[in-house]
Amino acid sequence: MKNIRNFSIIAHIDHGKSTLADRFIQFCGGLELREMSAQVLDSMDIEKERGITIKAQTAALQYKARDGQVYNLNLIDTPGHVDFSYEVSRSLSACEGALLVVDASQGVEAQTVANCYTAIDLGVEVVPVLNKIDLPAADPERISQEIEDIIGIEAVEAVRASAKSGIGIEDILEEVVNKIPPPKGDPDGPLKALIVDSWFDNYVGVVMLVRVIDGSLKPKDKIKFMATGAEHLCEQVGVFTPKSVQRPSLNAGEVGFVIAGIKELKSAKVGDTITLVSKPATEALPGFKDVQSQVFAGLYPVESHDYEALRDALEKLQLNDASLKYEPEVSQALGFGFRCGFLGLLHLEIVQERLEREFDMDLITTAPTVNYEVVMKDGTVEVVSNPSRMPEAGKYDELREPIITSTILVPQDYVGSVMTLCNQKRGVQRNMQYMGRQVMLTYDLPMNEVVMDFFDKLKSTSRGYASLDYEFKEFQSADLVKLDVLVNGEKVDALSLIVHRASSVYRGRELVAKMRELIPRQMFDIAVQAAIGGHIIARETVKALRKNVLAKCYGGDITRKKKLLEKQKAGKKRMKQVGNVEIPQEAFLAILQVGDK
């Protein structure tokens, strides 16, 4: 066991984590040259394209160190994005050490700080590495000072490397061997193995990525999951080099995969503990929790007969992504669809994109919302995530909205504008620290405001330099109202919003003005109104057309006419009938563009 090293890489998006992993694999001969592809560990196309890592992956590498011994290095790749923070904490708790990779030209970012603190809390040894040292803009002296100022770990001796050109790769591996402690565990005790990740394979069912803490596991063992109590027969175990290689057993301290013929991911939850039925462990490993959805949105097929196909697609996605939740819902405006729960906005975007790309779905997405707690007159508390399900104004005592604690790292020049933005979003400042050239702001913000467009605005006010990390804090009572949109006197449920009373009139006016631009003119006047309860607060009118001007095709080629007709047909397909007015897809997205004052 003393020659095993388990480590992961902590880095902000785009600081070169996956490229570094590729170099390790190449250096240790994990794959032959012809099998190398850029970003070997990012297996989804969308991961490669956006340059982000979503699922954790591993590689078991053999490294012959300068002291002549051969070490088994287990690299566990972690996602770097704030939406996937639970997956990160599980990956880190499977390791004894972590490489903190920082871009030598960009410096430390908020998500790096958050993940690094997670690592330190879990007692993981953090080894700093400065990457992209060959860039003309690299300034290693300043950045190592920044690491010390912000995170507070020694960084003077940080390895300087460039994953792209392969500089300093061996030095990093030496650091891993020398600085990171070997795993501790009892090889003969009862089996305890942590599920770091799990995914679905079409041939063998669920594949679990585990880190064995105590004991050992071999095929034909009967295993038990401690959180769910389910029992299964272990069929095969092995390691990834990144290709999968079967092994006769997995022992204490090792990281590998377990296949046990499990049909669905729900049974193999990330963070759960596996033990043997014959010799069970007394208590599970700490830190397991069920992941809760934070952001909700409605997904509707453009064509109503695609409903079944959308359900199948969501089921398949859920096989690989246990944090995606969905339930059927009906909207008067959009027909049948699903209400889906996500970890955050990035997660929502990724799911939407995968549905469109991998399953070829045409979707209409409603504006994202969050969970609200409604305290009814009789004292019961209901959780509502869909504005159109919100009870009438007189039926409840108070409304509570989720508050998050956000940490924003921003260069000093932009502090003023970022603070103004946070105040506009009803934020409460909790803390402010100067660290070198950066400032760390801590704010309590209503999640409702963050979901809308906070991230984009934060990036634009700080010219892209600010970075954000957040976690849920509590539900807090607030003066919120439900804003309805009426088109021709009929409520359009998919356009309902929950807003703060102070900004409701402004939001209503803006939304109605936007809708007026987007609703095509008909043969009659259309009234577009915004209402709170029975009280109309804003109105715009879409003026009627005088006559139809489709008379420009006199003679001419039939294909030309066909083309125009086809084009019109495609446009019609994307629109949905509401009463007697067609509302285009853009109108449902208009909610997102309605800013605050």
Swiss-Prot record:
> According to its UniProt record, which reaction does this protein catalyse?
GTP + H2O = GDP + phosphate + H(+)
What top-level class of enzyme does the UniProt entry assign? hydrolase
SMART domains hit by this protein: EFG_C
EC id: 3.6.5.n1
Q: Could you tell me which InterPro entries the record lists for this protein?
A: EF-4 (IPR006297), EFG_III/V (IPR035647), EFG_V-like (IPR000640), EFTu-like_2 (IPR004161), G_TR_CS (IPR031157), LepA_C_sf (IPR038363), LepA_CTD (IPR013842), LepA_IV (IPR035654)
Listed under GO biological process in this entry are: positive regulation of translation
Concerning PROSITE patterns, the annotation shows:
G_TR_1 (PS00301), G_TR_2 (PS51722)
- Binding-site list for GTP: 14-19, 131-134
Describe the location of the tr-type G domain by residue ranges. Answer: 2-184
Q: Which UniProt keywords apply?
A: Cell inner membrane, Cell membrane, GTP-binding, Hydrolase, Membrane, Nucleotide-binding, Protein biosynthesis
Tell me what topology the record assigns in the membrane.
Answer: Peripheral membrane protein
Q: Which GO terms describe its cellular component?
A: plasma membrane
Q: Chief localization class?
A: membrane
State the Gene Ontology terms under molecular function. Answer: GTP binding; GTPase activity; guanosine tetraphosphate binding; ribosome binding; translation elongation factor activity
Location of the protein in the cell: Cell inner membrane
- Per the similarity annotation, which family is this? Belongs to the TRAFAC class translation factor GTPase superfamily. Classic translation factor GTPase family. LepA subfamily.
HAMAP family linked to this entry: LepA
Q: What does this protein do?
A: Required for accurate and efficient protein synthesis under certain stress conditions. May act as a fidelity factor of the translation reaction, by catalyzing a one-codon backward translocation of tRNAs on improperly translocated ribosomes. Back-translocation proceeds from a post-translocation (POST) complex to a pre-translocation (PRE) complex, thus giving elongation factor G a second chance to translocate the tRNAs correctly. Binds to ribosomes in a GTP-dependent manner.
Q: Which NCBIfam families match?
A: lepA, small_GTP
What PANTHER family does the entry give?
A: TRANSLATION FACTOR GUF1 HOMOLOG, CHLOROPLASTIC, TRANSLATION FACTOR GUF1-RELATED
Q: What is this protein called?
A: Elongation factor 4
Q: Which gene encodes it?
A: lepA
